[in-house]
Amino acid sequence: MLASIPTEHGLYLAAALFILGLIGVLVRRNLIFMLLSLEIMLNATGLAFIVAGARWGEAEGQIMFMLILTLAAAEAAVALALILLVYRRFGTLDADRLSRMRG
């Protein structure tokens, strides 16, 4: 299926998703939205690996995607636990407010 999609289109899509995720991390102040934006960035890099692997007919792109997927799952679990602790302690998920509380 990926053989019929031009490589450039897949890489453009991956770049667009990565940029959207980066904008989300930089613009949003809610920690959960920042985490979701980071997940979008990780999925964009995985898509780039899959497209590049499909271009040359190699399995390394899919292997790297599985590694990225595993890393994203572990990162999400740890980050959600930390976000829950921050919310219980400070009562907010706004990154600006948290940095002001720190002093």
From Swiss-Prot:
Catalytic reaction(s) noted: a quinone + NADH + 5 H(+)(in) = a quinol + NAD(+) + 4 H(+)(out)
Keywords tagged on the record: Cell inner membrane, Cell membrane, Membrane, NAD, Quinone, Translocase, Transmembrane, Transmembrane helix, Transport, Ubiquinone
Enzyme Commission no: 7.1.1.-
Subcellular location: Cell inner membrane
InterPro entries: NADH_UbQ_OxRdtase_chain4L/K (IPR001133), NUOK/Mnh_C1-like (IPR039428)
Membrane spanning stretches: 7-27, 31-51, 65-85
Biological process (GO), any one: ATP synthesis coupled electron transport
GO-annotated molecular function: NADH:ubiquinone reductase (non-electrogenic) activity; quinone binding
Membrane topology: Multi-pass membrane protein
GO cellular-component term (any): plasma membrane
NCBIfam families: PRK05715.1-1 (NF004319), PRK05715.1-2 (NF004320)
Subunit structure: NDH-1 is composed of 14 different subunits. Subunits NuoA, H, J, K, L, M, N constitute the membrane sector of the complex.
Task performed by this protein: NDH-1 shuttles electrons from NADH, via FMN and iron-sulfur (Fe-S) centers, to quinones in the respiratory chain. The immediate electron acceptor for the enzyme in this species is believed to be ubiquinone. Couples the redox reaction to proton translocation (for every two electrons transferred, four hydrogen ions are translocated across the cytoplasmic membrane), and thus conserves the redox energy in a proton gradient.
Family per similarity comment: Belongs to the complex I subunit 4L family.
HAMAP family the UniProt entry points to: NDH1_NuoK
Name this polypeptide is given: NADH-quinone oxidoreductase subunit K
Organism: Nitrosococcus oceani (strain ATCC 19707 / BCRC 17464 / JCM 30415 / NCIMB 11848 / C-107)
Organism taxonomic ancestry: Bacteria, Pseudomonadati, Pseudomonadota, Gammaproteobacteria, Chromatiales
Record gene name: nuoK
